[in-house]
Amino acid sequence: AEIVAFDLDSRFVSPEQAERRFRHAAACVKPARLIYKTVDSTLRGNLGPETRGALTGSGRRLAIVAPAFPDAGRTTVGGRQYVDGVALEQTAFARDPKNPIVTSYVMERMAGLEPTRFQVFDAAGNGELDELVGRIGIAEPVVWVGSPGLAAALSRALSPEENAPLAQPPLRASKVLVAIGSLHPANDAQLASLRQAGAVLVTLPEAADPEAVAQEVRAAFARADVVCLMSPRSRAAAADHAAALGAVVSRCTPAFDGL
């Protein structure tokens, strides 16, 4: 295969487990031309231990860390991460129930990895990410660490012809299910816009019966082309809510063609 991807589910495990998972995964693809370790653009999770594991497993000495995702308003300026111009620790992400953020400094979020083994790069736009990739070079034996922004820059460098505009627009879904499991205020604004445009809201109750809620979702598609399924608004039992949300979605797949 040209691309091998690992879903290591390491955000909520201990730092030791996260490092071990990444070390084993990186060892499996050690000869690869390019090794890319994804990070959340709001710096949640075990960033330092994961990167340490990727470096150890791959045998590479240096990580290039550029977590900016300009298309989503996430930028890195002066080594600090911003969301729509607001320092990370001043945003709603600071109150994440599982991964509260107390600092926007990328260096501090990389704790657990020796400073000599990684370099942090600023980027406020896609052009800066493209320049970074060009400056380091695709062939350099490093571990790239970033969000979708850096991944897109690497893709543009690897296959510029494949990133040309599409000759035809992609097909549009006729029935769309919007699953909302985040408590971020931005989701409330997005949900309000969707409902104003005619979307139907189905709220997942506490201790829900997935099949009963799935029936409600399927019935809602008879009235609207867009149905929003929202998890309970409490921060307690977030993992249970996520599992219930997934159980409902899996039972509704015949009813929609866009998610």
Regions found by a protein language model. Give the residues of each.
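N-terminal glycine-rich anion-binding loops that anchor highly charged ligand groups
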Residues: A1-A5, C228
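Cap/lid and interdomain-hinge subdomains that line or gate substrate/regulatory clefts
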Residues: E2, V13-I35, V39-V143
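Short glycine-rich anion-binding loops that position phosphate/pyrophosphate groups of nucleotides
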Residues: S10-F12, D40-T42, G149-L150, L183, ...
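Glycine-rich phosphate/diphosphate-binding loops that line cofactor/substrate pockets in enzymes
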Residues: A27-P31, I138, P169-R172, V217-A224
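Hydrophobic alpha/beta core scaffold segments
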Residues: L34-K37, G146, R223, V227, ...
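Short amphipathic alpha-helices and their capping/turn segments at secondary-structure boundaries
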Residues: L55-L62, V213-A222
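Conserved, well-structured core segments that form the ligand-binding/active-site neighborhood
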Residues: Q81-Q215
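Anion-binding catalytic surfaces of enzymes that hydrolyze or transfer phosphate/sulfate esters
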Residues: A199-V202, Q215-P232
